[in-house]
């Protein structure tokens, strides 16, 4: 490996490491991370193919609350490096990348519970002094260990994979293991599908999963066509089963609003009578918007998104509070514990910006009201953001991109990158602007509309997931049942042929629901993956699987 490739590999793996911390641009997803590695090493096609296969395995790997999955960034970079430099087939590369990703999960937990906590406490000292530049610097300082956490292991694997005796050792792995792992790579994807189904968990909508499955099994529908089918079914479900419920929304809204605490209602009244002496404008809100592009970089295990949130709100606080003392109080107020889904956090930021504006104009809003609104919103928004964005939109777009990329088509990762970032930017912008304009009224609006949106999008997700089970899960049982002669030719009938005669793709469907059952019984996804890898090796060794 040349010095140029070494430097490029360091840069792209660092980008993926920072992406794993922020989860903004999705550069940490295997489909993107492997493509970047392929670009750095001069073999884009192999990188795209490795990333597509790894992405389908890792579809269900998502960060929810304090729960950290195996590191998808490391999985993607290692899979591509072993495929390109180590000259291994993709199945072997994925099988090695998965345990490395589990080790990366441990590294991330250590980083976020030690290094990033220390840096966050340094930010506390800057908040005490009213030093916004210091807080900003601490937020971005956490990006260094995040970058190195992925870059260093990736470079080590690249170095050793390039050494001749390591390649000889990899090539001497017994064929039953290498071929068995290759066989297992065909059905490891069911773990990701099952994880997403567990997150969605709306049983009355499961029939749409079977619609997608059957449509793909008995037709030549493409992934784009599958998405259109899912979107059409979602539209039908909304207009015929959900939209009519909106008639009752107006009747119940007052009742729902009454359920909010009295402080929130009082805040709303205060916000409607804003003093024009200090007024936030679109330029101020756009500063918050641009800061959100690296929102979750400084997430830590002690106070989670506190530094992220404070860093994002700094432009608003600097404009509203002119003295160091007032600014320091505001900064410390937003350095308290906070955590929600990063794509829905603009809603909280917008409401808080409106409240801080009212407070700066001497209206009757205290620290407890501002903090109380944050606490009241963060749970429901996380509960909606995780399934909608991580459980539906990201895996759906990633699966479509991966499906296009399996043959080495770079359009796959590009399409995924563009679509997911358009969704992200729309949510960031309008979530912030609308919530600022509505103030505390936003709470009622969210409670009314988000559950309906979730059910509608879940119809789309189930349809696509069902189709993916049929399209990308490969299980072949070549065991011979019997033979007979027809027109002088010997015809052999296998178990797979008999199963296909009953219903094609029966085994992929059964495997998916079996893993879904195990996950609901609290079996860790990593153990499911390891179990399927062992099944692939044993099945191939005894001639049961091919």
Residue ranges and their predicted role:
Residues 247-367:
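Soluble N-terminal domains of membrane-associated systems
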Residues 1-7, 37-48, 82-97, 402-414, ...:
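Helix-coil boundary and interhelical linker segments in multi-pass alpha-helical membrane proteins
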Residues 162-176, 474-496:
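Membrane-interface helix termini and inter-helical loops of multi-pass transporters
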Residues 93-95, 219-232:
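Loop-to-transmembrane alpha-helix initiation sites
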Residues 230-235, 536-546:
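Juxtamembrane boundary at the C-terminal end of a transmembrane helix
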Residues 1-74:
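Hydrophobic transmembrane alpha-helices
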Residues 94-189, 319, 325-466:
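Helix-loop-helix junctions within the multi-pass membrane cores of secondary transporters/permeases
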Residues 31-42, 83, 210-216, 513-519, ...:
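Generic transmembrane alpha-helix motif of multi-pass integral membrane proteins
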């Amino acid at each position: 490996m040349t010095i140029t490739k070494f430097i490029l590999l360091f840069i792209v793996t660092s980008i993926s490491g920072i992406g794993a911390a922020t989860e903004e641009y999705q550069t940490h997803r295997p489909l993107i991370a492997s493509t970047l590695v392929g670009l750095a090493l001069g073999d884009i096609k192999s990188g795209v193919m490795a990333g597509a296969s790894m992405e389908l395995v890792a579809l269900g790997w998502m960060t929810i609350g304090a729960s950290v999955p195996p590191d998808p960034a490391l999985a993607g970079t290692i899979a591509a490096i072993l495929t390109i430099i180590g000259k291994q087939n993709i199945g072997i590369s994925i099988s090695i990348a998965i345990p490395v990703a589990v080790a990366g999960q441990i590294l991330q937990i250590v980083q976020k519970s030690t290094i990033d906590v220390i840096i966050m406490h340094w930010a506390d000292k800057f908040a005490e002094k009213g030093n916004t530049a210091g807080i900003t610097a601490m937020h971005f300082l956490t990006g260094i260990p995040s970058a190195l956490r992925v870059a260093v292991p990736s470079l080590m694997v690249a170095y050793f994979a390039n050494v001749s005796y390591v390649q000889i050792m990899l090539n001497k792995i017994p064929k039953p293991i290498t071929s068995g792992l290759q066989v297992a790579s065909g059905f490891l994807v069911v773990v990701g599908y099952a994880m997403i189904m567990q997150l969605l968990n709306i049983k009355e909508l499961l029939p749409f999963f079977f619609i997608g499955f059957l449509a793909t099994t008995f037709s030549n529908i493409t992934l784009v066509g599958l998405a259109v089918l899912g979107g059409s079914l979602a539209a039908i479900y909304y207009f015929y089963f959900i939209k009519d419920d909106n008639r009752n929304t107006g009747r119940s809204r007052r009742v729902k609003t009454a359920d909010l605490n009295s402080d929130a209602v009082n805040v709303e009244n205060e916000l409607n009578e804003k003093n024009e002496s200090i007024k936030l404008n679109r330029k101020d809100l756009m500063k918050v918007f641009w800061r959100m592009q690296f929102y979750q970089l400084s997430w830590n295990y002690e106070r989670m998104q506190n530094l992220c949130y404070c860093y994002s709100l700094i432009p608003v606080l600097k404009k509203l509070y002119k003295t160091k003392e007032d600014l320091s109080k505001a900064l410390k107020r937003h350095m308290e514990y906070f955590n929600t889904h990063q794509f829905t956090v603009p809603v909280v930021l917008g409401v808080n910006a409106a409240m801080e504006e009212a407070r700066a104009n001497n209206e009757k809003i205290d620290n407890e009201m501002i903090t109380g609104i944050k606490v009241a919103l963060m749970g429901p928004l996380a509960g909606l953001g995780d399934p909608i964005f991580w459980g539906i939109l990201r895996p759906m777009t990633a699966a479509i991109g991966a499906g296009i990329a399996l043959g080495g088509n770079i359009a796959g990762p590009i399409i995924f990158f563009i679509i997911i970032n358009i969704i992200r930017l729309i949510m960031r912008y309008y979530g912030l602007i609308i919530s600022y304009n509505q103030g505390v009224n936003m709470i009622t609006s969210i409670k009314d509309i988000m559950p309906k949106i979730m059910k509608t999008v879940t119809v789309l997700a189930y349809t696509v997931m069902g189709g993916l089970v049929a399209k990308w899960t490969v299980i072949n049982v070549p065991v011979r049942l019997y033979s007979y002669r027809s027109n002088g030719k010997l015809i052999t009938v296998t178990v797979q042929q008999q199963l296909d005669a009953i219903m094609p793709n029966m085994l992929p469907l059964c495997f998916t629901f079996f893993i879904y059952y195990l996950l609901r019984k609290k079996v860790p996804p990593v153990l499911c993956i390891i179990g399927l890898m062992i099944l692939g090796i044993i099945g191939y060794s005894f001639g049961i699987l091919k």
